[in-house]
């Protein structure tokens, strides 16, 4: 099937919006238990003094990418493990090694089991499937609640090897006879164990654009006993392979190669490793429904669903990086957080001798995010609440970025508090055209010279994450977008800020259900689509600003505690959210339950407002009393600004208009009124967000109202 350039370019832009930074318009322009025991960890023989060997990884990836894309499934044969005698002169650093990994003379990965671990038993051969074993219902039933990863990178060979302890839960309604696990098609499953026993797992290749290769390798883990609904299971899995730049999914729909590669830049390399996770490159095990680009918004919804299902999961990662002599990485970021590196480089020896760097994250609870991993050779530079990891060629641009951060910081402090919860980390991407990526308080982007206005717009959004790193997408992204629009208001005026909101309203109106009977939509608390947790959330915060007032909203944002919010859980049945309580406590203790019920905890669509009628009448001393009747044909209630204007004055009051109902507001104004306006653009509607009625000027005329 042929696609036009316009359509493929649009698909690429949609992908960027779904998995990219979600900046303001300016930016778009420029378990506690169950951890891996030390006695069952990886150990790589001769890891410090092993010479690098040529790798066949690139050929493997090329072969996989040439597989017919029309086929639903294909099969592969993973590398055959060969026993390797351990080096006699080297002892493992502590503990009992029961599993080791090394590279043979041909650059192939080999594994072995230590004699101390008991009788060696080879894992069962991988079964090659002609069709997938799992069904979509089974894939959707699997929820990951714990990741414990031991990740080994050989950057010169673009190679990754992973051993992971995974805890999964059956969130379906029926028992699961097998567990579907998926990784990128450039990676190969090697071994899967359940209850310390090797299990068989047929492997199929699925067409899915959740990975940059356009395919996933799915292992269907056979269980001795079905996993009951609500029950959990731990799996011990091993896999490896190479991750090179690939834009196969975009090339398949006709996207120009240079555009595609600047969007899908994930790779493992000596100078830069960037693995953005599900939606870009599936470097950790997942269970997802296969989806492709061009099928409406299904891919982007699946990306959001993946992030939502991971929220609350525990995540630990230990990282080992083997690098060529003299090319030690200087920065590692796990899920956007800096992970201090310990580097051992054998100075003075042969240049082909590998060095080793190690890092770990200590464990965290995931929010609405896809786990990511970055390792790079960069130089650190500091700014206001900012750490910039920059390439040598981009040093000249650092001053522009630090100056912009210094300009924006006082504005953010006024709204969010004097001290951020963390620093913003900026990571310089290899190419100036590479698409930016944001996770938490980390922004990967090209550090290039740009105008102050553009950089300030970028950093007003990005720095907000250093203050407000919420596990709730609508707060994390919504507050960042909100602060971006407030910065526009501060610099360019309110009309410009409202114009920014209006530019995104039509997409939101298209996504929203016209009535609750057409579907449940996406409540903000569980939103998976950017148009909800970015656009609608920004509108919600603008409305709360008007309903509660700037001081109250600012106080609630300052008092917000992500850890306390997480303790409430991710279920909608946990009662009022912590943010709702903070708002009610920070102000005059006004009841906001009606607002959160219609705009956050449920998706009732958008209001559909109109001016039903206007009745002006003269009062005393040149004053007029104007009665404005406002109708709402939508299913979401709203508190609406109503403005009456005369020749020399204007008066604005707010009126709460119920869903599918009407409300009347009386306003007293000096001078004869000539215009009535309902809504000022801060409340998103299905058709328009500003309604104006001009009153008849001729004396004695009836108070007719006309919409412009």
Language model features with spans:
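Amphipathic alpha-helical substructures
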Residues: 420-421, 530-621
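A surface-exposed beta-strand-loop module
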Residues: 98, 107, 187-264, 303-309, ...
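Acidic/His/Gly-enriched intrinsically disordered linker/tail segments
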Residues: 474-550, 562-571
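N-terminal, polar/Ser/Thr-rich
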Residues: 72-161, 593-597
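Extended, low-hydrophobicity, Ser/Thr/Pro/Gly-biased non-transmembrane segments
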Residues: 236-371
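Solvent-exposed beta-hairpin/edge-strand motifs
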Residues: 176-205, 322-324, 647-652
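Juxtacatalytic substrate-recognition/specificity segment
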Residues: 378-475, 479, 483, 487, ...
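Beta-strand-rich binding/interaction modules
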Residues: 191-193, 328-331, 616-679
């Amino acid at each position: 099937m042929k696609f036009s350039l316009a359509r493929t370019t649009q698909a690429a832009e949609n992908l960027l919006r779904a998995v990219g930074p979600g900046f303001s318009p300016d930016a778009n322009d420029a378990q506690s238990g169950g951890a891996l025991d030390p006695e069952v960890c990886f150990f790589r023989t001769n890891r410090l003094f092993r010479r690098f060997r040529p790798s066949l990884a690139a050929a493997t990836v090329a072969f996989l990418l040439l597989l017919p894309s029309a086929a639903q499934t294909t099969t592969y044969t993973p590398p055959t493990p060969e026993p390797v005698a351990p080096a006699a002169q080297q002892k493992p650093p502590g503990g009992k090694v029961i599993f080791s990994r090394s590279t043979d003379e041909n650059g192939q990965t080999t594994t072995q089991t230590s004699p101390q671990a008991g009788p060696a038993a080879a894992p069962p051969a991988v079964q090659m499937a002609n069709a997938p074993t799992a069904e979509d219902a089974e894939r959707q039933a699997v929820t990951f609640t714990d990741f414990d990863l031991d990740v080994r990178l050989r950057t010169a060979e673009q190679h990754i090897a992973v051993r992971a302890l995974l805890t999964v839960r059956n969130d379906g309604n029926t028992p699961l006879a097998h567990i579907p696990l998926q990784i990128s098609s450039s990676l190969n499953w090697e071994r899967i164990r359940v209850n310390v026993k090797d299990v068989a797992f047929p492997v199929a290749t699925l067409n899915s654009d959740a990975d940059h290769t356009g395919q996933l390798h799915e292992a269907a883990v056979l269980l001795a006993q079905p996993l009951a609904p609500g029950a959990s299971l731990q799996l011990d899995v091993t896999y490896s392979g190479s991750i090179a730049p690939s834009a196969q999914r975009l090339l398949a729909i006709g996207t120009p190669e240079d555009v595609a590669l600047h969007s899908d830049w994930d790779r493992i390399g000596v100078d830069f490793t960037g693995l953005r996770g599900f939606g870009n490159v599936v470097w950790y095990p997942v269970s997802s429904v296969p989806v492709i680009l061009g099928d409406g918004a299904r891919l982007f919804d699946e990306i959001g669903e993946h992030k939502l299902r991971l929220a609350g999961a525990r995540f630990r990662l230990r990282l080992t990086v083997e690098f060529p002599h003299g090319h030690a990485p200087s920065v590692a970021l796990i899920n956007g957080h800096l992970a201090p590196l310990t580097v051992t480089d054998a100075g003075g020896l042969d240049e082909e001798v590998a060095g080793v760097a190690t890092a770990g994250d200590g464990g965290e609870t995931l929010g609405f995010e896809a786990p990511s991993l970055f390792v790079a050779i960069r130089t650190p530079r500091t700014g206001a609440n900012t750490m910039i990891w920059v390439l040598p060629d981009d040093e000249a641009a650092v001053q522009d970025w630090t100056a912009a951060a210094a300009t924006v910081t006082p504005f953010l402090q006024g709204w969010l508090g004097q001290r951020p919860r963390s620093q913003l980390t900026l990571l310089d991407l290899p190419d100036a055209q590479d698409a930016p990526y944001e996770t938490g308080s980390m922004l990967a982007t090209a550090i290039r010279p740009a105008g102050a206005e553009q950089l300030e717009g970028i950093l007003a959004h990005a720095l907000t994450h250093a203050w407000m790193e919420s596990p709730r997408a609508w707060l994390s992204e919504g507050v960042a977008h909100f602060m971006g629009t407030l910065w526009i208001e501060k610099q360019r005026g309110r009309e410009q800020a409202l114009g920014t909101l209006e530019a995104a309203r039509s997409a939101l109106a298209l996504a929203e259900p016209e009535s609750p009977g057409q579907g449940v939509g996406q409540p903000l608390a569980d939103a998976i689509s950017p148009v909800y947790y970015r656009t609608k959330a920004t509108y919600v915060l603008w409305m709360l600003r008007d309903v509660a007032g700037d001081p109250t909203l600012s106080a609630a944002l300052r008092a917000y505690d992500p850890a306390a919010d997480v303790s409430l859980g991710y279920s909608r049945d946990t009662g009022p959210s912590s943010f709702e309580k903070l708002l009610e406590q920070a102000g005059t203790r006004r009841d906001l339950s009606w607002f959160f019920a219609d705009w956050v905890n449920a998706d009732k669509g958008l209001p559909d407002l109109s001016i039903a009628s206007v009745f002006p009448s003269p009062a005393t001393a040149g004053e007029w009393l104007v009665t404005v009747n406002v109708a709402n044909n939508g299913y979401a209630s709203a508190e609406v600004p109503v403005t009456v204007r005369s020749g020399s004055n204007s008066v604005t009051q707010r009126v709460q208009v119920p869903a599918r109902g009407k409300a009347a507001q009386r306003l007293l104004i000096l001078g004869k009124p000539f215009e009535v306006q309902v809504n000022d653009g801060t409340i998103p509607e299905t058709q328009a967000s500003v309604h104006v009625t001009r009153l008849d000027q001729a004396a004695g005329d009836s108070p007719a109202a006309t919409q412009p």
